[in-house]
Amino acid sequence: MSAISIQSVTKRFPNGFEALKGIDTEIQTGSFTVVLGPSGAGKSTLLRLMNGLETPTTGAVRIDGETVDGHRLRHIRSKVAMVFQQFNLVERLSVVTNVLTGRLAQRSWVGSVFYLFRQEDLGIAREALARVGLTDKAWSRADKLSGGQQQRVGIARALAQRPKVILADEPVASLDPVSSEEIMALLREICDRDGITVVVNLHQVDLAKRFADRIIGMNAGRVVFDGTPAELSAQALRTIYQREGIEDDTSLDLALAYA
């Protein structure tokens, strides 16, 4: 069964820029998919459509069989957790309070506004922190953590939501290589253990090849590759990193180093 269905989707912004051009794809439940491509390829726009942060100009996006639109957006977003490049934590709050914000979609409007959580929520938050190895940091301020630790808090917040899908937008772009490896391994473990569908935007080819079940390569708003890591050849990478008929030499050289 498809966790995510994208049918004939285009996205055109008011300035006329067409970020996505006729995207058709299905992402299977419980799979780990990496969307790979250079900056400006449309990767982030695609993820934002999956969570209703953007709306398609044409076409439809469905999560768990439900169309992502304004009518049931809160309900759909409760199924879809986001992990962000810049962590999106409230730095002055404690780690556990940041994780608890993952429960807001399960609370009433009043509870969301006033950060009213139940004892059950606190238990879920503590369990999520244990999963990411940060139990001892629960009452520390978020801004006292390292970048890798802050991203672990972001993942714990996603887990606390009890989602069916986790969307991670360049989750390791600002991390060192060791932390990047640890974060990708953690997302992979969550996918395997919990059966949560994970979609990750990356530009690191080596990480994509090591952790993904499937790689979707994008260039200039189109899907130009769709296959397994073993099928990601040097020629496929050239197609992904070609820019308006000219190869993006810096990105391509880095990509080919891991082909």
Swiss-Prot record:
<comment type="subunit">
    <text>The complex is composed of two ATP-binding proteins (PhnC), two transmembrane proteins (PhnE) and a solute-binding protein (PhnD).</text>
</comment>
<keyword id="KW-1278">Translocase</keyword>
<keyword id="KW-0472">Membrane</keyword>
<keyword id="KW-0813">Transport</keyword>
<comment type="function">
    <text>Part of the ABC transporter complex PhnCDE involved in phosphonates import. Responsible for energy coupling to the transport system.</text>
</comment>
<dbReference type="InterPro" id="IPR003593">
    <property type="entry name" value="AAA+_ATPase"/>
</dbReference>
<dbReference type="InterPro" id="IPR012693">
    <property type="entry name" value="ABC_transpr_PhnC"/>
</dbReference>
<dbReference type="InterPro" id="IPR027417">
    <property type="entry name" value="P-loop_NTPase"/>
</dbReference>
<dbReference type="InterPro" id="IPR003439">
    <property type="entry name" value="ABC_transporter-like_ATP-bd"/>
</dbReference>
<dbReference type="InterPro" id="IPR050086">
    <property type="entry name" value="MetN_ABC_transporter-like"/>
</dbReference>
<dbReference type="GO" id="GO:0016887">
    <property type="term" value="F:ATP hydrolysis activity"/>
</dbReference>
<keyword id="KW-0067">ATP-binding</keyword>
<feature type="binding site">
    <location>
        <begin position="37"/>
        <end position="44"/>
    </location>
    <ligand>
        <name>ATP</name>
    </ligand>
</feature>
<feature type="domain" description="ABC transporter">
    <location>
        <begin position="4"/>
        <end position="245"/>
    </location>
</feature>
<keyword id="KW-0918">Phosphonate transport</keyword>
<keyword id="KW-0997">Cell inner membrane</keyword>
<dbReference type="GO" id="GO:0005524">
    <property type="term" value="F:ATP binding"/>
</dbReference>
<dbReference type="InterPro" id="IPR017871">
    <property type="entry name" value="ABC_transporter-like_CS"/>
</dbReference>
<dbReference type="GO" id="GO:0005886">
    <property type="term" value="C:plasma membrane"/>
</dbReference>
<keyword id="KW-0547">Nucleotide-binding</keyword>
<keyword id="KW-1003">Cell membrane</keyword>
<dbReference type="Pfam" id="PF00005">
    <property type="entry name" value="ABC_tran"/>
</dbReference>
<dbReference type="GO" id="GO:0015416">
    <property type="term" value="F:ABC-type phosphonate transporter activity"/>
</dbReference>
<comment type="similarity">
    <text>Belongs to the ABC transporter superfamily. Phosphonates importer (TC 3.A.1.9.1) family.</text>
</comment>
<protein>
    <recommendedName>
        <fullName>Phosphonates import ATP-binding protein PhnC</fullName>
        <ecNumber>7.3.2.2</ecNumber>
    </recommendedName>
</protein>
